[in-house]
């Protein structure tokens, strides 16, 4: 691909240009409150297909459709279940994707052969302004090469997407740092497919019932299994280095790193730990603070690439609350290499 890529401020002129490109069936990278995304008109199958080419994304990985509010759902979904209405009232606009029965107007390319579609209502003013200016619901995955860490600023988008799409809107750093929570309301019970800033506990409170948790959140998806949500693929969010997640105390972590000094490893650790380890380190947030970890995890994984690291040992976060989202991204970055110390 050899497309001239322009980076523009996310001001009125930039938003107008983005809207024009979307209406023409082109791609635009833009900020959301979670991570930067690559947008295409969700009703234009040819435009949506360009996302898969730009990212090198497998065709069996469905896309999320972004709208400003429930009034845009006509034709995109065939029904809005009661559970979806409860979740939209509680969390939208915001970092939540709700899987609903697919409608006739959404491009088949968005859905990977499924009879469902993920719908999100972003709260970021730039994303909302582009939807309103273009009149398009847009399909948008994260704006990175497939399998790499998601970008949280325009420079990281440019690193991956230069020459692959015509426009990147620079809206500064993203607020949350990990992708949206994905929950399905199709079937007998609601099911969490991807953790994010809206936690399992948040969902259960809003719905007043237990939410099932997909095994794919914390385990490798079996070969040939149907991918029902973005973020379920085997290896994802990964830097170039071989990452191994070490689950234990700091003392156990340090002892393991010291014992493997011959590998010349680097470490992905919590705030304040780097100076105690004696090897190159990147810190990804305060221990026990899921929000801080989520805000920095993808930028930290990209920093490992910038250092040229080959072997990385990573501190393991908690596996509940908001930290579940961080753990979910890290085990995929590590291709499920986890050592219990």
Task: Label each PLM-derived region with a short phrase.
Residues 1-341:
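Active-site-adjacent structural elements in enzyme catalytic cores
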């Amino acid at each position: 691909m050899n497309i001239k890529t322009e980076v523009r401020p996310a001001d009125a002129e930039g938003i107008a240009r983005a809207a024009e490109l979307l209406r023409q069936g082109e791609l635009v990278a833009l900020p959301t409150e979670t991570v930067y995304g690559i947008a295409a008109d969700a009703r234009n199958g040819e435009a949506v297909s360009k996302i898969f080419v730009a990212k090198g994304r497998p065709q069996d990985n469905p896309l999320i459709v972004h709208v400003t509010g429930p009034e845009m759902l006509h034709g995109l979904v065939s029904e809005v279940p009661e559970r979806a209405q409860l979740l939209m009232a509680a969390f939208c606009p915001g970092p939540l994707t709700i899987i609903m029965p697919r409608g006739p107007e959404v491009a088949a390319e968005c859905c990977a052969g499924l009879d469902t579609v993920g719908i999100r209502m972003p709260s970021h003013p730039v994303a909302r302004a582009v939807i309103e200016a273009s009149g398009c619901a847009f399909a948008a995955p994260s704006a990175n090469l497939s399998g790499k860490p998601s970008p949280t600023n325009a420079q990281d988008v440019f690193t991956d997407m230069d020459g692959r799409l015509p426009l990147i809107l620079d809206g500064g750093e993203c607020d949350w740092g990990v992708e949206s929570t994905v929950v399905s309301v199709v079937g007998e019970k609601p099911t969490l497919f991807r953790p994010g800033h809206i936690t399992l506990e948040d969902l259960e409170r809003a719905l007043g019932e237990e939410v099932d948790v997909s095994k794919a959140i914390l385990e490798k998806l079996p070969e040939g299994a149907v991918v029902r949500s973005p973020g379920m693929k085997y290896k994802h969010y990964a830097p170039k280095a071989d990452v191994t997640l070490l689950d234990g105390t700091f003392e156990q972590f340090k002892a393991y790193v010291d014992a493997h000094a011959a590998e010349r490893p680097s470490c992905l650790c919590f705030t304040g730990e780097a100076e105690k380890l004696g090897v190159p380190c990147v810190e990804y947030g305060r221990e026990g603070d899921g929000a801080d970890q989520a805000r920095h995890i993808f930028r930290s994984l990209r920093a490992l690439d910038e250092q040229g690291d080959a072997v990385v040992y990573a501190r393991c976060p908690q596996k509940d609350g908001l930290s579940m989202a961080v753990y979910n991204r890290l085990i995929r970055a590590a291709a499920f290499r986890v050592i219990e110390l």
